[in-house]
Curated annotation (Swiss-Prot):
Cofactor note: Binds 1 zinc ion per subunit.
Any GO BP annotation: translation
NCBIfam families according to UniProt: L31 (TIGR00105), PRK00019.1 (NF000612), PRK00528.1 (NF001809)
Cofactors that this protein relies on: Zn(2+)
Entries under Pfam families matching the protein: Ribosomal_L31
UniProt protein name: Large ribosomal subunit protein bL31
Cellular component GO terms held in the UniProt record: ribonucleoprotein complex; ribosome
SUPFAM superfamilies: L28p-like (SSF143800)
Family stated for the protein in its record: Belongs to the bacterial ribosomal protein bL31 family. Type A subfamily.
Coiled-coil segments on the chain, per record: none
Subunit structure: Part of the 50S ribosomal subunit.
Keyword Ribosomal protein listed: yes
Length: 70
């Protein structure tokens, strides 16, 4: 590898809004603030919501006079 052309690879801390602190290494060179992490993201915590689009489909079919398949 060429000398002097690569960014410095340093240890940083990434702090989540929930308070979780993650120590990692990066070329960013400064500490990061995260909005979500694995401890508070709804997908990983099991609090994920399913968006119901059934009403939208029925409204579309009604608007364009498409008979329902149910």
């Amino acid at each position: 590898m060429k000398q002097g052309i690569h960014p410095e690879y340093t240890e940083i801390t990434a702090t989540c809004s929930c308070g979780n602190v993650i120590k990692t290494r990066s070329t960013v060179g400064k500490n990061l603030n995260l909005d979500v992490c694995g401890n508070c993201h709804p997908f990983y915590t099991g609090k994920q919501r399913v968006v119901d689009t059934g009403g939208r489909v029925e409204r579309f079919n009604k608007r364009f006079s498409i008979p329902s398949t149910k």
